UniProtKB/Swiss-Prot annotation:
The keyword Oxidoreductase applies. Pfam families: GDC-P (PF02347). The glycine cleavage system catalyzes the degradation of glycine. The P protein binds the alpha-amino group of glycine through its pyridoxal phosphate cofactor; CO(2) is released and the remaining methylamine moiety is then transferred to the lipoamide cofactor of the H protein. NCBIfam families: PRK00451.1 (NF001696). The keyword NADP does not apply. This is Probable glycine dehydrogenase (decarboxylating) subunit 1. Its EC number is 1.4.4.2. The gene is gcvPA. The glycine cleavage system is composed of four proteins: P, T, L and H. In this organism, the P 'protein' is a heterodimer of two subunits. It is an enzyme of class 1 (oxidoreductase). PANTHER family: GLYCINE CLEAVAGE SYSTEM P-PROTEIN, GLYCINE DEHYDROGENASE (DECARBOXYLATING). One of its GO terms (biological process) is nucleoside metabolic process.
Length: 448
């Protein structure tokens, strides 16, 4: 090239055309019909100096509404939580900052151990036997859990609560479209929790699995013990989609007999960054270990007796046994899993518990303030989210709240007409009393 930063000068183009035997760019694209070719230059501005360009891009970026510029009460799967500063410092180290899969244990012990620690932490939170190295996000983990259930039980029906995140259900239906024999039965809600009578009636001997969220999408805590009692006699698997931060306080799904626990570790060290990337986790019992999707890191000893880590049980993966593999997922979110591991380790067991308690306390305070303001707050024992009914469209309310530097809650009318004019509000440990009071006050004014 004539210049290291300016490729494709006229000289470069002529050399390339000569090499392939074309006289001009027009001749190169001669097979393309002329009526679909653009016969003018693209409407792109001339190049700018770096300082000018950065100034312009920063000006454009400043138009974004972020948690740095506004107070956020938006959750619905992505939350504004405290992330220890050590997280970014550690994951930025060059040893970790790579997308490379650690196939060669002799040069990857650091990354392999980090993944192993992530698996260990997830098992401790969920009270399960085995966890994989991570997945793309919680919704992918959930759909893969359902596929595992179909494969393990040889049954074709899965019963899912409508209390699951609506996008998780969408991903499941997308998976099911490619497997026409699979049947997905959705169970209605009773208020903001699963209708247990309808759930019990739907579970039969043809059911591969029953799946619920804990806490569910509407913020309420499902009765896992009772749900498990409907399942045990039917030889179906019990799948729980759980918020890992909530498990620092709530009884873990494994203690209720869950067979598969999945979710997203975004609450631990992963910022709410315009939709992603996230980090799914997948935990299960030892019985199902050989059907777990994705990577598994195991602990072993080298020939000198030293502790070491390797990718293990790879024969179950699609890059080894494509035709017999349970899953076609052959990757993970190692960097985000590392971020979550560092966050969990920095906080410690007590720190995670304390933050979980603060989420419940702050959310309950906000609930009471909305009730005092005359709002209808839907019943349900919650963690850090709850549902409030408004008299006006939520989109309209949220557009007005932005003027006060407040990001309002999620518009549940997007999910179901049954929740028209209902807002799903998230209140995490980062929300202060003053912020909550201001939010409730402005919401009340806008609702009049």
């Amino acid at each position: 090239m004539s210049h290291r930063y300016i490729p494709l000068t006229e000289k470069d183009k002529q050399e390339m055309l000569q090499t392939i035997g074309a006289k001009s760019i027009g001749e190169l694209f001669g097979d393309v019909p002329s009526d679909i070719l653009l016969n003018r230059d693209l409407n792109i501005a001339e190049g700018e100096a770096e300082t000018t360009l950065l100034r312009r891009l920063n000006r454009i970026a400043s138009k974004n509404i972020t948690k740095e510029t506004h107070t956020s009460f938006l959750g619905a799967g992505v939350y504004d939580h405290y992330a220890p500063s050590v997280v970014d410092a550690m994951i930025s180290r060059s040893e970790f900052y790579t997308a490379y899969t650690p196939y060669q244990p002799e040069i990857s012990q650091g990354e392999l151990q980090a993944i192993f620690e992530f698996q260990t932490l997830i098992c401790e939170l969920t009270d399960m036997d085995v966890a994989n190295s991570s997945m793309y996000d919680g919704m992918t983990s959930f759909a893969e859990a359902c596929i595992l259930a179909f494969s393990q039980t040889k049954k074709n029906k899965i019963v899912v609560s409508k209390g699951l995140h609506y996008q998780a259900l969408q991903v499941l239906h997308t998976y099911a479209k490619t497997r026409k024999e699979f049947e997905v039965v959705e169970i209605d809600l009773d208020g903001t929790v699963t209708d247990l009578k309808k759930l019990e009636a739907a579970v039969d001997d043809e059911t591969a699995a029953v799946a619920v969220q804990y806490p569910n999408f509407y913020g309420s805590i499902e009765d896992l013990e009772k749900i498990q009692s409907f399942i045990e006699d039917k030889k179906a698997l019990f799948i729980v989609y759980a918020n890992p931060l909530a498990l620092g306080l709530l009884t873990p799904p494994g203690s209720f007999g869950a067979d598969i626990v999945v979710g997203d570790t975004q609450p631990f060290g992963i910022p709410a960054q315009f939709g992603g990337p996230h980090c799914g986790y997948f935990a299960t019992t030892k019985k199902l270990m050989r059907k777990v999707p994705g990577r598994l890191v195991g602990q072993t000893q080298d020939d000198e007796g030293n502790r070491g880590f390797v990718l293990t049980l790879q024969a179950r993966e699609q890059h080894i046994r494509r035709d017999k593999a349970t899953s076609n997922i052959c990757s993970n979110q190692a960097l985000n899993a590392l971020a979550s591991s560092i966050a969990m380790s920095a906080l410690g067991k007590q720190g995670i518990y304390d933050i979980a308690v603060q989420n419940i306390e702050h959310a309950n305070y906000a609930k009471q303030q909305f009730i005092k303001k005359g709002f209808e707050v839907l019943d349900g024992t919650s963690f850090n989210e709850f549902v409030v009914k408004f008299d006006k469209p939520i989109q309209q309310v949220n557009e007005e709240l932005v003027k006060y530097n407040i990001i309002g809650g999620f518009d549940l009318g997007v999910v179901s007409d049954d929740f028209k004019n209902h807002m799903l509000i998230a209140v995490t440990e980062l929300r202060t009393k003053d912020e909550i009071d201001t939010f409730v006050e402005k919401a009340g004014e806008l609702n009049d």
